[in-house]
Amino acid sequence: MKFFSYILVYRRFLFVVFTVLVLLPLPIVLHTKEAECAYTLFVVATFWLTEALPLSVTALLPSLMLPMFGIMPSKKVASAYFKDFHLLLIGVICLATSIEKWNLHKRIALKMVMMVGVNPAWLTLGFMSSTAFLSMWLSNTSTAAMVMPIAEAVVQQIINAEAEVEATQMTYFNGSTNHGLEIDESVNGHEINERKEKTKPVPGYNNDTGKISSKVELEKNSGMRTKYRTKKGHVTRKLTCLCIAYSSTIGGLTTITGTSTNLIFAEYFNTRYPDCRCLNFGSWFTFSFPAALIILLLSWIWLQWLFLGFNFKEMFKCGKTKTVQQKACAEVIKQEYQKLGPIRYQEIVTLVLFIIMALLWFSRDPGFVPGWSALFSEYPGFATDSTVALLIGLLFFLIPAKTLTKTTPTGEIVAFDYSPLITWKEFQSFMPWDIAILVGGGFALADGCEESGLSKWIGNKLSPLGSLPAWLIILISSLMVTSLTEVASNPATITLFLPILSPLAEAIHVNPLYILIPSTLCTSFAFLLPVANPPNAIVFSYGHLKVIDMVKAGLGVNIVGVAVVMLGICTWIVPMFDLYTYPSWAPAMSNETMP
């Protein structure tokens, strides 16, 4: 028993050594550059999937192994660890830092929920819409962590209002007050059931913005242990948790900067196919927004039906008097919004810079008309989305966070201390350096596959798949990444599959975008398990869900997601990128139109 206990304690160390030794015959026996690169790929992939080593540490292995095998010089490998992607990420994180520092994200979320009304079904849609919108610009993780406490307060107020109605009715019929059902009517989060807000870390994750921290409302007493007054209250909490987790992931699909998988794909694609000018912020948004919108609406309908039933008459009734629960819900949202006070100077500046950044991204090269990048026609392709992100990001360090002068009691106007909207220390606390290293490792691995000839070898071996219909190849690859991403991190999954799917597309004479776009989108469909992605873990940590709840709900959302992506890649996305024709910017192949 003591021996097994030692194995259990040192299992990670033993697994790392075991993996390295078991795979070692591959380069020793074959002794080709392809085999040596395959050994590196298998070792890195195994450690990424099992997380035997931290993801970022594993991502550094190509910088060690590729030079040792003579595949690439160390200087060339090192250059893969900092690319245009990293500059784009820095600019986006500057924006995210200012948004969260000045609470603009909370104001946007509450305002959007106030706009949709207090009907339970529409309220849920409001939370999903606001969460998805924020997730377009912030990380999925921080969006879920920010919206959940707001949703918790709203749902708690609904449950309290229901209990109040029950107590009032019982008092009316019995002629006496039922003290057991008295509740605290305050909507202040510190007064409801003597709850207090704590920060609860979710272990084992490093994602879009680094460490995960979710604001979890925990009971001070044993109230949460006795769980819920009614089954409906429990179901409502489940529904709210799942809506926020799933919508934060769905919203990230919409923009290149919305989630790390999109960024990894964009950088890989632009590096492998530098002559392609068709993929940018605007073109990505144009094809992904309809897909994300459809997935969001269908997921909302699915979750409503699964947990509450779908009563159209109740949902779309007009001119009816609001119930006590709906009034209470509206009140708590209103009071939470009022706590923010009037919009401040810092929020206005952040919002203006945010809008300018989005407009510059869209107008750089919209496709249907010349963009502002045409002003630099002498240097085509020099200005990218990272140029815009860095320009706006720099302004956050320059623009003062408050007016630079003040009036003294004597009426004299004097200058006082200058401080920018964000500081470098604040930026560093938000910057996901682990993701930056992880992405760099993926690029280094992809470069190694190209230099060694492994990518070409894989493509040749997969070329028999060309006999299958293109839609079937896309479906198979989409289902593969959707399944794998449930047990592996999204960035690791997409980094692993891109160097495999690109040569496959080239080998079977298919437009690479035809396979890579759906595979990239499906990599984000990690809806089944709490450990599948950080937003799932955040909402699961509130204690309202069981694993089986997430599996049942997530299975439906997964099916919806894959179906919508397949619909999009066969309809509106086709003419945008001429997907049925093998492009001139791909490696030399005879231009053929797919049957």
Swiss-Prot record:
PROSITE patterns: NA_SULFATE. This is Solute carrier family 13 member 1. It comes from the Eukaryota. Inhibited by thiosulfate, selenate, molybdate, tungstate, citrate and succinate. It catalyses: sulfate(out) + 3 Na(+)(out) = sulfate(in) + 3 Na(+)(in); selenate(out) + 3 Na(+)(out) = selenate(in) + 3 Na(+)(in); thiosulfate(out) + 3 Na(+)(out) = thiosulfate(in) + 3 Na(+)(in). Sodium:sulfate symporter that mediates sulfate reabsorption in the kidney and small intestine. Can also mediate the transport of selenate and thiosulfate. One of its GO terms (cellular component) is plasma membrane. Glycans are attached at N174, N207, N591. Its main location: membrane. It is found in: Apical cell membrane. It holds the Pfam family Na_sulph_symp. GO terms for biological process: sodium ion transport; sulfate transmembrane transport. InterPro entries: Na/sul_symport_CS, SLC13A/DASS. GO terms for molecular function: monoatomic anion:sodium symporter activity; sodium:sulfate symporter activity. Belongs to the SLC13A/DASS transporter (TC 2.A.47) family. NADC subfamily. Highly expressed in kidney; not detectable in the other tissues tested. The chain crosses the membrane at residues 13-33, 41-61, 77-97, 108-128, 131-151, 239-259, 290-310, 348-368, 381-401, 464-484, 491-511, 512-532, 554-574.
